[in-house]
Design a protein with these regions (language model features):
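Basic, flexible Lys/Arg- and Gly-enriched helix-loop patches that mediate nucleic-acid binding at interfaces
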Residues: 1-236
Length: 236
């Protein structure tokens, strides 16, 4: 019982043991007798202090990442995206699904479900990632063609076909990649003589950055959104 309740991230196992001793934990309306009590978290109604807990086997979070945070669980060089989450979520062992550069903003998923996270990042599944980008200079249709054909960068990096869609004056665009290489968007843009001045990820697969989610804030994914991720990653 203590392990089940602690997995929600709301309480530590020590706190759960104290709550059980105080008679504040109910399972299907009956007081839990011991931290070692067994229950099926998928079907049992577990309440603490009168509040029914929502059990999630795995946790999935959408974060609108701000600039200045590292996509890591811990890093001595500066604050990480985990610092943007409350303590009860950090207790659940969440980690970022892939990486965004420190100065890149936008959609970042965090989870404690390693298998699905691995599948989403696997080159075998080619999950699209879309970025909004602002550059110094002007992009043209010639750049769109070069992206579509695949770029061979001077540092030896070979990039697969990517979609570049220009916005208005050509200093802004959307880029869709089907692979994930180190600093890829920045390196591709630099190779065309249009260095990136701002970068934001807006989509991963069929999951779009929530337009109502403020920068630096997070929300839980819905059950349907998680199922959609399983489908596009081949995990179903």
């Amino acid at each position: 019982m203590d392990k089940i309740i602690a997995s929600t991230g709301r309480f530590s196992r020590r706190e759960v043991k104290n709550l059980i001793r105080q008679g504040l934990v109910l399972v299907d309306g009956l007081p839990a007798r011991s931290p070692q009590d067994k229950a099926d978290p998928e079907t049992a109604e577990i309440a603490v202090g009168g509040e029914v807990l929502t059990y999630r086997r795995f946790t999935w979070v959408m974060l609108n990442k701000p600039s200045g945070y590292l996509s890591a669980t811990e890093d001595g060089r500066g604050p990480t995206v985990l610092d943007l989450l409350p303590e009860e979520l950090r207790r659940q062992g969440l980690f970022p699904v892939g990486r965004l550069d420190k100065d890149t903003e936008g959609l970042l998923l965090l989870t404690n479900e390693g298998g699905l996270a691995h599948d989403l990042l696997s080159p075998r599944h080619h999950v699209d990632k879309e970025y909004y980008v602002e550059v110094a200079g002007r992009l043209t249709e010639a750049d769109c063609l070069a992206f579509a054909q695949g770029l061979s960068l001077g540092d030896g990096l070979e990039c697969k076909s990517a979609e570049l869609r220009l916005l208005e004056d050509g200093s802004r665009a959307h880029v869709t990649l089907r692979e994930g290489k180190f600093h890829q968007v920045k390196r591709m843009m630099a190779s065309r003589g249009t260095p990136v001045t701002y970068l934001e990820r807006v989509r991963m697969g069929n999951l779009h950055l929530d337009s109502d989610l403020p920068r630096g804030e997070f929300r839980f994914l819905t059950a349907q959104e998680v199922e959609d991720l399983r489908e596009i990653s081949g995990s179903l």
